[in-house]
UniProtKB/Swiss-Prot annotation:
Its main location: host cell. Belongs to the Bcl-2 family. Changing E14A: Complete loss of viral lytic replication. It comes from Human herpesvirus 8 type P (isolate GK18). This is Apoptosis regulator Bcl-2 homolog. It is found in: Host membrane; Host mitochondrion; Host nucleus, Host nucleolus; Host nucleus. Residues 37-42 are annotated as: Mediates interaction with human NOP53 and localization to host nucleolus. It is a single-pass membrane protein.
Amino acid sequence: MDEDVLPGEVLAIEGIFMACGLNEPEYLYHPLLSPIKLYITGLMRDKESLFEAMLANVRFHSTTGINQLGLSMLQVSGDGNMNWGRALAILTFGSFVAQKLSNEPHLRDFALAVLPVYAYEAIGPQWFRARGGWRGLKAYCTQVLTRRRGRRMTALLGSIALLATILAAVAMSRR
């Protein structure tokens, strides 16, 4: 393999960072992004304060700082126990950094060039492919999003039932 050619997964990770972090149109290289994008953007929104805290102690507005963030991605899988949750945390973190650098074109472009490579190495290409690659990640995200929607719907129906009970009790008390 030519050392100057990046693996397809790296280009796809760059696309995820662009679609999720920079709100660019979904990446043309892989049509499986929608559930992945929904998961990552939801995680970015829900855990924004956590990601902000992670960046608070790093001077990431430099190429050295961006490289430090990439090295920190490698630590996520340092114990050899990769799973989809960790993989998504890495992808979300890279997307969050891209978002934070969106108004600094040179640093953003540098981050989009190097962080996908770090993410690729952190997730581990063999691990990723052995678990179905992008289709496996899409299936995981779809499953988690479906469970979340199910819990939200259960909570919504429970709230509606409670409201109906209260309204019925109020109506009965007026008779």
